[in-house]
Amino acid sequence: THACMDLKLGDKRMVFDPWLIGPAFARGWWLLHEPPSDWLERLSRADLIYISHMHSDHLSYPTLKKLAERRPDVPIYVGNTERPVFWNLNQSGVQLTNINVVPFGIWQQVDKNLRFMILMDGVHPEMDTCIIVEYKGHKILNTVDCTRPNGGRLPMKVALMMSDFAGGASGFPMTFSGGKFTEEWKAQFIKTERKKLLNYKARLVKDLQPRIYCPFPGYFVESHPADKYIKETNIKNDPNELNNLIKKNSEVVTWTPRPGATLDLGRMLKDPTDSKGIVEPPEGTKIYKDSWDFGPYLNILNAAIGDEIFRHSSWIKEYFTWAGFKDYNLVVRMIETDEDFSPLPGGYDYLVDFLDLSFPKERPSREHPYEEIRSRVDVIRHVVKNGLLWDDLYIGFQTRLQRDPDIYHHLFWNHFQIKLPLTPPDWKSFLMCSG
């Protein structure tokens, strides 16, 4: 599924990025594929699990909760990123007891035949990582979500290269409106961006000359009915289109992974034409999901709406003071909404001036960039209450945005998506003071 793969390396089993149940990014992303029915058993038997970064389509707490109930001491390996991958472990309530943080660029020896090395991303070193796994001298390179894996220094002629291909992992431009953001502009932008990504990936594969290329991760869908607009607008790249582009330009063999299918790398390296090298899913295997268990996950989000902290409007000052972003000329209007992004009757609607972290009743008279963020009330309150990162809102398509002028405020978004404090606001003492 998505970024999760089960590797059998001699007598060792290794699993990448297990997201096998529940949503990612609050309620915005759901699994495209139906995981094999024995996924939990197989995950519990893993000798090691690699989790590339903290985004919830790679670090899936619903999945890890199930795993921890069976085997809390399963060995998990993560890179030593500036923001710890498991920064939110205590809050999550998931009991995992064998998380190993390893330095970048150093081989980790598993046994005499197997070793792996975690590498950082050149563009998002504070968060993203990728991995090289080597078994008996044969290398598997999984670049995961890295924009510039290992700063562009990558091994040539690996046995297998895996790299993301789909695009669409951002709220931009689907969740934007006003100004140039017409439906025609969005459609054209998305089409152009996806094509650029395909060509970039095909060129990377051509340059690195792996024996086999596998398009992965990128298998998610915006399946909640309330997100129909996003699903229809946010067109993803088709893995087969990328594979065809690669075949046109090089001798590289390609393989699109599906649940229940197997790539026998040992056989394929001996003879790329071996018909037993790629085993298709057994007859009758369900490949794509056609139903998702929305209820329990939406209930968790909904539980935040009526929380006591939101009875006191002073939560706003408390929260943004905790967040710690200021001295930046930007005024943001935050509006709580219903499912359809219409202002919620009785919901909060307020201004934050980040120049001096004040909360004015109207926009200041000085010149200032302005952004309006409408957020579904269940998600914004869940995020506020638990001190979560705003990826849930932005990458999860849970906001609608307008901005004037039309510029991306990198410092603002980077702070709320990566740099928030590691512990949530102290709502307990807030309530004692407010009570």
UniProtKB/Swiss-Prot annotation:
This enzyme's EC code(s): 1.14.18.2
Gene3D superfamilies for this protein: Ribonuclease Z/Hydroxyacylglutathione hydrolase-like
Subcellular location: Cytoplasm
Functional pathway: Amino-sugar metabolism; N-acetylneuraminate metabolism
The keyword Metal-binding appears for this protein: yes
Cofactor binding comment, as recorded: Binds 1 [2Fe-2S] cluster per subunit.
Named cofactor requirement(s): [2Fe-2S] cluster
Signal peptide per UniProt: none
Single biological process term from Gene Ontology: CMP-N-acetylneuraminate metabolic process
One of the record's GO cellular component terms: cytoplasm
Keywords: 2Fe-2S, Cytoplasm, Electron transport, Iron, Iron-sulfur, Metal-binding, Oxidoreductase, Transport
GO MF term list: 2 iron, 2 sulfur cluster binding; CMP-N-acetylneuraminate monooxygenase activity; metal ion binding
EC class of the enzyme, as a word: oxidoreductase
Entry-linked InterPro entries: Cnh (IPR027033), RibonucZ/Hydroxyglut_hydro (IPR036866)
Source domain of life: Eukaryota
Similarity section: Belongs to the CMP-Neu5Ac hydroxylase family.
Role description: Sialic acids are components of carbohydrate chains of glycoconjugates and are involved in cell-cell recognition and cell-pathogen interactions. Catalyzes the conversion of CMP-N-acetylneuraminic acid (CMP-Neu5Ac) into its hydroxylated derivative CMP-N-glycolylneuraminic acid (CMP-Neu5Gc), a sialic acid abundantly expressed at the surface of many cells.
PANTHER family associated with the record: CYTIDINE MONOPHOSPHATE-N-ACETYLNEURAMINIC ACID HYDROXYLASE (PTHR46522), INACTIVE CYTIDINE MONOPHOSPHATE-N-ACETYLNEURAMINIC ACID HYDROXYLASE (PTHR46522:SF1)
Protein name: Cytidine monophosphate-N-acetylneuraminic acid hydroxylase
